[in-house]
């Protein structure tokens, strides 16, 4: 049986950085759509971006082929370029400093390993329908305390 084809759009937002933050993911499979979002106090935009991706992937019950869309180059570069070097260096950067948000990166690495993922960067606020909707949900999460 072939893997299901899924699209996930994610976004994170912060009111202040650090400050109250929101994250959102829109999961699309055939005619099915699921929106998830949440809020955290005293967080950062990058943490919210990572949290959005992690929670979007956790929704999936089976191994899938995923097109994952993020407007965060931090997430895209981190998972596609930097993470393997960090792991080889004991979760240290090239400057020998601990990787920021290491626990979230480890969790993302774990949940992502269960899927085939094509990581795609979308320019924020450029008119991409689902990216705009994920952004709205993440911002809504901040104010819906």
UniProtKB/Swiss-Prot annotation:
GO-annotated molecular function: magnesium ion binding; nucleic acid binding; RNA-DNA hybrid ribonuclease activity
CDD domains (UniProt xref): RNase_HI_prokaryote_like
- HAMAP family the record matches: RNase_H
Q: Where does Mg(2+) 2 bind?
A: 11, 135
**InterPro entries tied to this protein:** RNase_H (IPR050092), RNaseH-like_sf (IPR012337), RNaseH_domain (IPR002156), RNaseH_sf (IPR036397), RNaseHI (IPR022892)
Main location class: cytoplasm
State what protein this is by name.
Answer: Ribonuclease H
Q: Which GO terms describe its cellular component?
A: cytoplasm
Highest taxon listed in the record's lineage: Bacteria
**Pfam families for this protein:** RNase_H (PF00075)
Disulphide linkage map: none
Q: Which reaction does it catalyse?
A: Endonucleolytic cleavage to 5'-phosphomonoester
What the protein does comes down to: Endonuclease that specifically degrades the RNA of RNA-DNA hybrids.
Stored Gene3D superfamilies: Ribonuclease H-like superfamily/Ribonuclease H
**Keywords assigned by UniProt, alphabetized:** Cytoplasm, Endonuclease, Hydrolase, Magnesium, Metal-binding, Nuclease
Q: Where in the cell is it found?
A: Cytoplasm
Quote the cofactor binding remark: Binds 1 Mg(2+) ion per subunit. May bind a second metal ion at a regulatory site, or after substrate binding.
Q: What's the cofactor?
A: Mg(2+)
Subunit description: Monomer.
Where the record annotates domain RNase H type-1, the positions are 2-143
Q: Write down the PANTHER family for this protein, in alphabetical order.
A: RIBONUCLEASE H1
**Gene field:** rnhA
Q: Which organism is it from?
A: Wolbachia sp. subsp. Drosophila simulans (strain wRi)
Protein residues bound to Mg(2+) 1:
11, 49, 71
Enzyme Commission number(s) from the entry: 3.1.26.4
């Amino acid at each position: 049986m072939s893997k299901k084809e899924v699209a996930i759009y994610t976004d994170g937002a912060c009111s202040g950085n650090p400050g109250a933050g929101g994250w959102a993911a829109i999961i699309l499979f055939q005619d099915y759509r699921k929106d998830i979002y949440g809020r955290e106090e005293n967080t950062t935009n990058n943490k919210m971006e990572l949290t959005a991706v992690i929670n979007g992937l956790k929704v999936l019950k089976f191994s899938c082929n995923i097109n994952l869309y993020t407007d965060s180059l931090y997430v895209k570069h981190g998972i596609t370029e930097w993470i393997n070097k960090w792991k080889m260096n004991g979760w240290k950067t090239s400057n020998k400093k601990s990787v920021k948000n290491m626990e979230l990166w480890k969790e993302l690495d774990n949940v992502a390993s269960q899927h085939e993922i094509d990581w795609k960067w979308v320019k924020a606020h450029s008119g991409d329908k689902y990216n705009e909707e994920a952004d709205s949900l993440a911002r809504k999460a901040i104010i819906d305390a």
